[in-house]
Amino acid sequence: PTVDDGRPTDPERTLWVDMTLITVLTTLTIVPYLAASIQAPIPEYVAALVSSIIMVFSLLLRRDHPGALMALLLVGGLIQLIFVPFPVLSIIAVPIASYAVGRWTAGRQSRIILWLGTIGAILGPLRWRDTLAADYDSSGTPWVMWFLATTVCLGLVVTPYAVGRRLREAALIESQ
């Protein structure tokens, strides 16, 4: 007997879902940085634009090539970590990717996203700390802001992964 992980069987429907997702995310996460880069072409905005393009369009690989998705997401995240001192809207790609890797990747390989996501959830908010806490006194507020941002970022990695894993397990059990 073949084991089915529940992948969609209607290519036309998945194409429409993918195109809708990319169109919405492009509008929400790429267009603002494109406009900002045109108005004020500073390196931070250009890096935010480039990383957003990489992260959003990598989601097209989520069902068939989750490993490539993780690699491209890592590249986009590293660009943000190195060049952008503020949170970028395209981090919304992270929970979508985390779910996809949990859902469509077998075994231990799927847990790589948890390690990468945990590192990103710590380093990203650490990079943003000065920007997020710019209007607060330095007594302890910056570290509270970092802790809260880190907790939210960890939740955006772990929760979708767990949901994707459970759905994968349920589909595999049902197919047996």
What are these regions (language model features)?
Residues P1-M70, P125, T131-A133, T150-T151, ...:
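N-terminal signal-anchor/first transmembrane helix of integral membrane proteins
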Residues L21-I22, I91-Q176:
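Cytosolic coiled-coil signaling helices that couple upstream sensory modules
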Residues P43-V46, P66-L72, I79-V94:
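Subset of alpha-helical transmembrane segments and adjacent helix-loop junctions
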Residues S52-R62, Q80, V94-G107:
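Generic transmembrane alpha-helix motif of multi-pass integral membrane proteins
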Residues L60, P85-F86, W104, R165:
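Histidine kinase transmitter module recognition
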Residues L78-Q80, A121-I122:
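A short hydrophobic/aromatic micro-motif that marks alpha-helical segments and, especially, helix-coil
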